Amino acid sequence: MTMSHSKIKVLVQSNYCRMVTGFGKNMKNILLALHKDPDIEVIEAANGVPYGRDICTPWESYGTYPSDQKILKAVEKNPSKKRAAQYGFYNIDSIVEKCKPDVFLGIEDIWAFKEYENKAWWSEVKTIIWTTLDSLPILDHALEVEPKCDQMLVWASFAEEAMKDLGHKTVATVHGAVDYSHFQPLDNRNELRNLHAVDSDFVIGYVFKNQLRKSVPNLLEGFKKFKEKNPEVSTKLLLHTDWGEKSMGWDIPRYLKEKGLDNGEVLATYVCHKCDDYFVQPYSGEDKDCSSCGGKKCVKTKNSGKGVGEKELNEIYNLMNVYCHPFTSGGQELPIQEAKAAGLITLVTDYSCGTDSAYEHQGGLPLAWNEYREPSTQFIKATTCPDSICERLEEVYNMSESSKSKLIKTGIEYVKEKFSVQNTVSQLKHFIKNVEKRNEKPEETKKESEAKKIKIEDFLKDVPLEERIAVVLPRSAGDVLIANSLMENLQSLYPDKKIFFVTQPEFYDLINDNPFVHKVIPYSESFESLYTLEGIGGHKGLFDIAFLPHCMTQKTYSYHHNGKDKNQFKLR
């Protein structure tokens, strides 16, 4: 696609920039910076926001989540299609068609871009996938996508090294953008600690989304061991997370009881949904009354929909004496960098992205771990050793003030150098402005062209002509999904026939699992002619009946059907 305008139009797809997630924070930071560049026009494709909803941002923005109830109903019972909807698969085509970008920049986990390489627009724009790869062995889909996009970027050097070891030499690391200007040691730190009644405590902190890959049981066990070995130390564990998320995360109160830990020694962050005030105190359930504004049942522990602002989060970091981040694997783990910038020594599992943050030259100390395999994927995962957590906590507690200051200063400088918005955006601009379209080798193009020369008859030869029905719908994802939901009804109308669904290859996955579709056939323009499909004169055609729901009668004669179509309308 040639550029006909002075600015480079960049469509950026990721979590909505106002979401309180790692991807959301990164999205906000890079969009604010790219928007200021006179050579770049940014457009946001916001995952998590319904398509068609007004989004108040300084730049052009579109929600990617389906708003069509028919599509939502069609994907509801299929987990893979439901996940695709959450990642914007069914609306990204319409957004690309509207804004006609020069560059597509996708920032999500790699599975968010499943089948994107088969989309019609993929070869027309420069494509950059900036993804999080957090475990070994590298996911097969990442290895398949890398040669098909113009540039693959990863969030952690761990992933870059693994990809290059497998022959993918152009992969580069660009860390997620941390606006460290919000995070720094505060002069009124002691006043804040006194306000929240932790002024005499050794506070261990962990900021995280409550999900199973965050090693909460390991941390609680390490905390318990530290307390048992150091009974004279008044210790608190501050878990800044969504305690109420028990269905997909950890039931933290249950683990406290199981491990015999005093509920008063483990703190939670509460946020008022009316006045936005926050409180750090022992967990006592959700939907509490607000002591600041008097609101009823409006105070909950922080969650991805409602958290604290950056200023308040920095205050929470300043309540801590040390930051501890045990996890099974991760793409970057932004709270680690925030904690460093806020003046904390960070204890981090040295696996996956942890290798970018765990060592002394990075302002941290590594946590030992043992390997286990994730049953469903066979990925190598880390289970952090509670004994190592205990030992590192003791090391920090007993560390001299000069050694602490040196390590903290190292961490602050490291974040500014490696993870700053300026550094990240500078690298992104380089790739946006300089990446070239991959050129296929002539011999490869020829082989692929030959492979695509498949005769339609090859799909039809096992079914007699009089038993064939064609449904032709080349695009888009939403229309294909809706049509797919009608195939059972079509089969009931024509029980003696086999249904052949004709669509573009990028939509095969939406159809393949439908038991009422006999075969899926790749679309070509020849399928636009009803006479070619159903026959005329001496030409018998390819199907007994063919339906072209995307064609208007004013455009194409599409309602002949050899006089064999049926209807379900009854006149009384």
Q: Language-model segments: what does each one mean?
A:
Residues L139-H141, K164-D165, V178-L195, W250:
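Acidic anion/phosphate-binding donor-loop and adjacent secondary structure
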Residues T384, E401-I432:
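A charged, aromatic-enriched C-terminal amphipathic alpha-helix characteristic of glycosyltransferases
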Residues T328:
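Aromatic "clamp/platform" in nucleotide-sugar-dependent glycosyltransferases that forms part
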Residues L11-V12, V198-K214, L220-F223, L237-L239:
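Conserved donor-binding/catalytic core segment of Leloir-type glycosyltransferases
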Residues E443-R572:
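Catalytic machinery of carbohydrate-active enzymes
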Residues F158, A177:
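Carbohydrate-associated surface elements
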Residues G249-K311, E315:
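Nucleotide-activated donor-binding/catalytic signature segment of Leloir-type glycosyltransferases, i.e.
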